Regions:
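Catalytic center-proximal scaffold of phosphoryl-transfer enzymes
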Residues: 1-136
Length: 136
């Protein structure tokens, strides 16, 4: 992605991303989005990665995949701290590649969702846990 508008907006984007990363804690997620591949006339699946920090800004980053290498473009090499994310293996591989500089924290919304899914097979037990998580 490039062009005149992108060139003008890049310093603003980088400032927002720097601010989000400055706190040593960031929430990261990737969302699949179908996009029209230029010159092909067909749609493909890409990913809109988000980085956010409570009571701070949010930034968005576009990638055509959700590979571990994409996180190098989302998380600056200078970042140290905690990344809150889902259980997708790319986050673990990314953190392991950075040594001891990154700690992963799970996402309660994803944990809670799994208990809702388990309600069909074990409604009494699985139904109790979402209420406990909500109290947190």
């Amino acid at each position: 992605v490039g062009g005149l508008a992108a060139d003008w907006l890049k310093p603003i984007y980088e400032q927002i991303r720097t601010g989000v990363m400055a706190g040593g804690y960031v929430q990261v997620d990737e969302t699949p989005i179908d996009y029209l591949e230029p010159g092909n006339g067909k749609t493909r699946q890409g990913y809109l990665w988000t980085g956010s920090r409570p009571q701070a800004d949010v930034f968005f980053h576009w990638e055509t995949s959700r590979a571990t290498a994409c996180l190098d473009n989302v998380i600056p090499a200078t970042f140290t701290g905690t990344i809150q994310c889902d259980g997708y293996a790319a986050y673990r591989a990314f953190a392991n590649g950075r040594g001891q500089t990154i700690t992963l924290a799970g996402c309660w919304a994803h944990v809670r969702r799994k208990f809702y899914e388990a309600r069909e097979s074990s409604p009494r037990l699985a139904g109790w846990w979402p209420n406990q998580i909500q109290q947190l």
